[in-house]
Amino acid sequence: MLTTQDKQNIIKENQQSEGDTGSPEVQVALLTARINDLQGHFATHKKDNHSRRGLLRLVSQRRKLLDYLHGKDVERYRALIKKLNLRR
C-alpha cells in the first residue's frame, strides 16, 4: 500500500507544473506504483482472484491513459514509457 508520502513523491517527480496532480503522466505514474505494489501481494497470495480482478482494472485504466497520451503527444508518451520502464 502506498503511503501519502510515497504518493507526494511520485507526483513531484512527474508533474508538469506546480500543483499538477491530474496530468496523464502523474496518473500513470501513480497507477504504476499501485500495480507494482500489488505484484508483490500476488507472489505470496496466488489464489486471490478477487484482488487480481482489481489489478486488471488498474492495468486497463493505465493502458487507456497511455493511449490517450500517445494520441495527444507522442514525445511525452515516449518519455514517460522510458522513465517508468514500461514495455510497449
Curated annotation (Swiss-Prot):
**Bias type Polar residues, positions:** 1-20
Q: Name one GO cellular component term.
A: cytosolic small ribosomal subunit
A single MF term (Gene Ontology) = rRNA binding
SUPFAM superfamilies membership: S15/NS1 RNA-binding domain
Question: Mind listing the GO biological process terms from this record?
Answer: translation
Organism superkingdom:
Bacteria
User: Which keywords does this chain's UniProt record carry?
Assistant: Ribonucleoprotein, Ribosomal protein, RNA-binding, rRNA-binding
Q: Which InterPro entries match?
A: Ribosomal_uS15, Ribosomal_uS15_bac-type, uS15_NS1_RNA-bd_sf
Q: Which Pfam families match?
A: Ribosomal_S15
The ranges of region (Disordered) come to: 1-24
Q: Which family does it belong to?
A: Belongs to the universal ribosomal protein uS15 family.
The protein's matches in PANTHER family, at most eight in alphabetical order, are given as:
RIBOSOMAL PROTEIN S15, BACTERIAL AND ORGANELLAR, SMALL RIBOSOMAL SUBUNIT PROTEIN US15M
Q: What does this protein do?
A: One of the primary rRNA binding proteins, it binds directly to 16S rRNA where it helps nucleate assembly of the platform of the 30S subunit by binding and bridging several RNA helices of the 16S rRNA. Forms an intersubunit bridge (bridge B4) with the 23S rRNA of the 50S subunit in the ribosome.
Q: Describe its partners and assembly state.
A: Part of the 30S ribosomal subunit. Forms a bridge to the 50S subunit in the 70S ribosome, contacting the 23S rRNA.
Cited NCBIfam families:
S15_bact
Please identify the protein, giving its name as recorded.
Answer: Small ribosomal subunit protein uS15
Q: To which species is this protein native? A: Francisella philomiragia subsp. philomiragia (strain ATCC 25017 / CCUG 19701 / FSC 153 / O#319-036)
Gene for this protein? rpsO
